[in-house]
Amino acid sequence: MEFPDHSRHLLQCLSEQRHQGFLCDCTVLVGDAQFRAHRAVLASCSMYFHLFYKDQLDKRDIVHLNSDIVTAPAFALLLEFMYEGKLQFKDLPIEDVLAAASYLHMYDIVKVCKKKLKEKATTEADSTKKEEDASSCSDKVESLSDGSSHIAGDLPSDEDEGEDEKLNILPSKRDLAAEPGNMWMRLPSDSAGIPQAGGEAEPHATAAGKTVASPCSSTESLSQRSVTSVRDSADVDCVLDLSVKSSLSGVENLNSSYFSSQDVLRSNLVQVKVEKEASCDESDVGTNDYDMEHSTVKESVSTNNRVQYEPAHLAPLREDSVLRELDREDKASDDEMMTPESERVQVEGGMESSLLPYVSNILSPAGQIFMCPLCNKVFPSPHILQIHLSTHFREQDGIRSKPAADVNVPTCSLCGKTFSCMYTLKRHERTHSGEKPYTCTQCGKSFQYSHNLSRHAVVHTREKPHACKWCERRFTQSGDLYRHIRKFHCELVNSLSVKSEALSLPTVRDWTLEDSSQELWK
């Protein structure tokens, strides 16, 4: 018959006996603090106490712990854990508990403390990263919204035209995701409208009998749509997208006139580029009128905004593409189309880095550039971009590794040096003050650290715990033993190591030790 609560009841009784001082057979001293406890409990929970009591059980009533490593509050917490099975850190630093548990060889507590320190560091790093991301997102959204409203107000508009007569050029993000094949749209070149490729009519084209809306009104409607799209994609702006964008299949096989939409830098306005192929059926319809509208849109949008909102690192690309475009317009006929490479450079040069995931997938892979989303620098390959991004992350990790100003870090008041916990600070302060709190009761000699006092105490007890393996001579200090071995047994040790390496037998070392010791006694 088992009693499941027996162990809990036993611990409770032992804890009450400890608080009452009943049957406590040892005293643990940590600095000036004294703790009464039971040897059996201490030896069961700590390997340090187990080894301490193993050899001389009757002569170890008082146990001195190194107060430079184990603090009194930390040992009190560990003593409560031994008797109650509960670990409550309260306001005690985790570093002090970790140092005390390591000193007492309480490995379960060491694991818990290391885990808590790791979680604490991860939490601080995540909170710092969220604050930086939130501030960067808000700054980008404000700058984009201000730029969009400013340019939209400067563009000419036709207020007399109705909303139903304006060309809705850009499809929504939902339409782009649902119908990737309709990413390129046709623009009607006459008042009656032209049937679209594949037998589908354009949903936003004007009906028969109505005139096409002017480029100014079309551009105005596009600017209004761009402002709302930037506000909707504020969260997407913070995402780090390093994937290589691929072009849509079938762009090269378009057999009808088309245009491509492009967001102008930061303002997210659309610059309409219209080209027509050399088709005999469509080459004679409204050519002169349409070319005039096309040139008006191009001059009003590109020349006014290209210089004002162009980043410094994209200026060479932009100027180069503009020169090539002007030469192409002077030499090319009406039936020529823009090459995919120049179109990609133009679109990516005028595109905000956060909008590249939405637009660059419709461009050809030739002549790709890779932009850093943090500093907007351009790189020729994704591998170089990854190397560049690692420098940003190293800088951020270095900033996060610095302790915050509001955190209570143990700091020396004299030299300003910081420490991980209080016991190392107290140990360091003795180097400034010259304090020697540990005094020998036999001769009155003082020491700065407790381990020096323990080593000195052996002189008065005349114990010789350090024995030589070769001649059985014993010494008080370990240093005396090492000097003795170097002086008398150095050649013997070297010869033994050479023999053991040459023979490589598992028992050759023990055999040689016995033989040599017999030779020494002759």
UniProtKB/Swiss-Prot annotation:
Record has Phosphoprotein as a keyword: yes
Protein name (database record): Zinc finger and BTB domain-containing protein 18
Biological process according to GO: negative regulation of DNA-templated transcription; negative regulation of transcription by RNA polymerase II; positive regulation of transcription by RNA polymerase II; regulation of transcription by RNA polymerase II; skeletal muscle tissue development
Transmembrane annotation, as ranges: none
Subunit-level organization: Interacts with DNMT3A.
Region (Interaction with DNMT3A), start-end ranges: 310-427
Tissue expression summary: Lymphoid tissues, testis, heart, brain, skeletal muscle, and pancreas and, at much lower level, other tissues.
Compositionally biased region (Basic and acidic residues): 121-143
Family: Belongs to the krueppel C2H2-type zinc-finger protein family. ZBTB18 subfamily.
Alphabetical list of CDD domains matching this protein: BTB_POZ_ZBTB18_RP58
Record-linked Pfam families: BTB (PF00651), zf-C2H2 (PF00096), zf-C2H2_4 (PF13894)
Sites of the Glycyl lysine isopeptide (Lys-Gly) (interchain with G-Cter in SUMO2) crosslink: 273
Gene transcribed to yield this protein: ZBTB18
Disorder: Intellectual developmental disorder, autosomal dominant 22: A disorder characterized by significantly below average general intellectual functioning associated with impairments in adaptive behavior and manifested during the developmental period. Additional MRD22 patients have limited or no speech, and variable but characteristic facial features, including round face, prominent forehead, flat nasal bridge, hypertelorism, epicanthal folds, and low-set ears. Other features may include hypotonia, poor growth, microcephaly, agenesis of the corpus callosum, and seizures.
Species name: Homo sapiens (Human)
Cellular component terms per the entry's GO annotation: heterochromatin; nuclear speck; nucleoplasm; nucleus
Chain intervals for the UniProt region annotation (Disordered): 121-164, 190-221
Location of the protein in the cell: Nucleus
Domain of life the protein comes from: Eukaryota
